[in-house]
Amino acid sequence: MIQARNKLSQEELSEAKKLINCCQNYDGTYRDPYLSNMLNFDPNMPAFFLYYEKGELVGLLTVYADDQDVEVTILVHPDHRRQGIARALFTSFEKETASFSICSVTFQTERIFLERHPDFVNNWGLVEDEETETWLGKDRRPYPLANVSNLEVLLADSSYQEQISQLKFQAFSEEHESREVVDRYVAEALKDPESRLYILLKDGQVIGTCTVDLSTNTNYFYGLAISEPERGKGYGSYLAKFLVNQLIEQNDKEFQIAVEDSNVGAKHLYEKIGFVKQTQVVYLNEKGARDSEV
């Protein structure tokens, strides 16, 4: 039985996390799908499809849709694979979201999963995208970090919203993020009890920002950005190190960060400060859709 939801209840969230954990342990994967519809372009669109068998959640499809080019992740319990559950979930997703203005669908998976399931791409008629992403992890060892008198890291509030949006838009506009999407990210991060939006001030001016997602079993850093004129001066690593040290005192989680493989500089920075590669996230497009764009 498949149930479609635009938002998960606490019980469903708990079941989903249990299934994700089970699949990760079995497959050797690391990436947690996003279990909120907070950033989706239409909050009414079904974003979670749950497949139950005898009262147990054995399949999950999640939809990440900050714009009309949506990303889908499908997870099936190891004991229930090759029974058509993934297909059934995707068919349900197509049917339930047909009335919403979706332009394209991209599947998210991990390199290790594709290596262990080499027929998956062909069986589903998919083609691998050139863009890939590396997820890196770090243990709870703190950094030796001296205070710098003219630098300050603060938990942001709404008075900084415009400055943060402007900085993020300049940093990430090449990733085809519209200003509207960036504004939504910032506004929701400020509201979300599971997020912490930090800013780095230099002489009182916002020169950096980073969001920490606390909703999974790691402190997940994303959207770390330094303003253009201040790059290459060590401020990115200072902000990351400061946040690691602070969060070690606040919770008992380890750390994760994701970076596009094309962003060689950022990847090098994270590796230099002790983050270690966990997995490569791969994006798969439907063949027809990809061909029609070319």
Residue ranges and their predicted role:
Residues 1-35, 146-177:
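Short amphipathic alpha-helix that is part of the acyltransferase structural core
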Residues 24, 32-97, 110-111, 210-219:
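Conserved donor-binding loop and adjoining core beta-sheet/short helix segment
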Residues 24-53, 175-211:
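Active-site rim helix/loop that mediates acceptor-substrate recognition in acyltransferases
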Residues 67, 78-149, 284-286:
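Acyl-donor-binding surface of acyltransferase catalytic domains
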Residues 72-74, 105-109, 221, 255-259:
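Conserved hydrophobic beta-strand within the GNAT/NAT acetyltransferase core sheet
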Residues 73-83, 224-232, 260:
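A short, internal acetyl-CoA/4′-phosphopantetheine-binding micro-motif in the GNAT/acyltransferase core
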Residues 82-95, 226, 232-249, 267-272:
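Conserved acetyl-CoA-binding loop-helix of GNAT-fold acetyltransferases
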Residues 130-160, 253, 258-264, 279-294:
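C-terminal "cap" of GNAT-fold acetyltransferases
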